[in-house]
């Protein structure tokens, strides 16, 4: 089987990671003790992608839980599926990273990283054929961002030919618990650009807006945001977890989605949007699902796809529905909105259908877009970064852990280059070959 090793780092990473395992265990018919109580062979056919089979027909998540303080992992352990994880795979420190990227990357995190890599090796060695790694983390704090990116680069060194996939939560002033989030996020993106193959940008700004505007929650909690994240993560991993033809492993997904190696930041979307614990009264039709899925209000990144163009798109429909209708609707969207898809990648929209819907829904659709509009997210963080950096505010916390100001300057310019690259391909047409090779000549768009 083609296995994936899952790593969750930091408070946010552990919380969305724990939710992810709750949701997919439920979908695969696995209870909190790891026993199977399902009703369909489809649930077990590719169970080995995410679970190890242990003695007594127990299924154990191939998950590694990492943090620099014990608190969050204690609450995962005492949570609904806390007992399903392998106890040896909890790796934690005591000091905390204090929302400081440098502590996670260079000091505290660097001390813990080898014990994490031991567990990574152990899990990888017991795999039949490892396809790659997925990391859940946030970019705003210290551990998920600093130590998360340290782990990525160490794993990259040791497993250069395996796919590295991240679910990265982007910070937003609307749900902020730290002033230095733009610093942590910028130096993290600097790492992700170079060291990951696929990054799902899960943007707190967008999650907050969905809860507030669409779900009419006046004071959204992290629990509400994480409900949306787990629905999205379940959706984008459907093709990996259930039998099917399209994007059935991480590498095939990357080949379909990433036309240029640096431009691997995806905008996820989901339909229908529901709040926690709510039941759906009426199943949506395929046209409604398709229309909602492409709507900017359903995007998990606070970017408007209409401000950019799609390089590539993958769509996953779940539930019992007519394949013919799905194909018609997807063509319909492309024909009506052809100006929003780059014309120099023909057939750049791929669709998969999986029979098993998520819990509580008759059918759902998940959207993965590689859109040039994602530059709006990077611009937002870059502006916040620059505002503080030009005054050198809070820098002493980072230089005190041995970081150099140059690192900040480099990260800033790398992010601005990324924005320019997206802009360059947004403006590119099919007939002007040879004018842009690799580098965008303009400084900043």
UniProtKB/Swiss-Prot annotation:
One of its GO terms (cellular component) is cytoplasm. One of its GO terms (biological process) is neuron migration. SMART domains: Tubulin (SM00864), Tubulin_C (SM00865). Some glutamate residues at the C-terminus are polyglycylated, resulting in polyglycine chains on the gamma-carboxyl group. Glycylation is mainly limited to tubulin incorporated into axonemes (cilia and flagella) whereas glutamylation is prevalent in neuronal cells, centrioles, axonemes, and the mitotic spindle. Both modifications can coexist on the same protein on adjacent residues, and lowering polyglycylation levels increases polyglutamylation, and reciprocally. The precise function of polyglycylation is still unclear. Some glutamate residues at the C-terminus are polyglutamylated, resulting in polyglutamate chains on the gamma-carboxyl group. Polyglutamylation plays a key role in microtubule severing by spastin (SPAST). SPAST preferentially recognizes and acts on microtubules decorated with short polyglutamate tails: severing activity by SPAST increases as the number of glutamates per tubulin rises from one to eight, but decreases beyond this glutamylation threshold. GTP binds at residues 11, 69, 138, 142-144, 204, 226. Keywords: Cytoplasm, Cytoskeleton, GTP-binding, Isopeptide bond, Magnesium, Metal-binding, Microtubule, Nucleotide-binding. InterPro entries: Beta-tubulin_BS, Beta_tubulin, Tub_FtsZ_C, Tubulin, Tubulin/FtsZ-like_C, Tubulin/FtsZ_2-layer-sand-dom, Tubulin/FtsZ_GTPase_sf, Tubulin_C. One of its GO terms (molecular function) is structural constituent of cytoskeleton. The modification 5-glutamyl polyglutamate is found at residue 438. Its cofactor is Mg(2+). It holds the Pfam family Tubulin. It comes from the Eukaryota. Highly expressed in skeletal muscle. Mg(2+) binds at residue 69. Residues 429-445 have a biased composition (Acidic residues). It is found in: Cytoplasm, Cytoskeleton. Residues 424-445 are annotated as: Disordered. A motif (MREI motif) lies at residues 1-4. Dimer of alpha and beta chains. A typical microtubule is a hollow water-filled tube with an outer diameter of 25 nm and an inner diameter of 15 nM. Alpha-beta heterodimers associate head-to-tail to form protofilaments running lengthwise along the microtubule wall with the beta-tubulin subunit facing the microtubule plus end conferring a structural polarity. Microtubules usually have 13 protofilaments but different protofilament numbers can be found in some organisms and specialized cells. Tubulin is the major constituent of microtubules, a cylinder consisting of laterally associated linear protofilaments composed of alpha- and beta-tubulin heterodimers. Microtubules grow by the addition of GTP-tubulin dimers to the microtubule end, where a stabilizing cap forms. Below the cap, tubulin dimers are in GDP-bound state, owing to GTPase activity of alpha-tubulin. Belongs to the tubulin family. The MREI motif is common among all beta-tubulin isoforms and may be critical for tubulin autoregulation. This is Tubulin beta-1 chain. It comes from Gallus gallus (Chicken). The lineage of its organism: Eukaryota, Metazoa, Chordata, Craniata, Vertebrata.
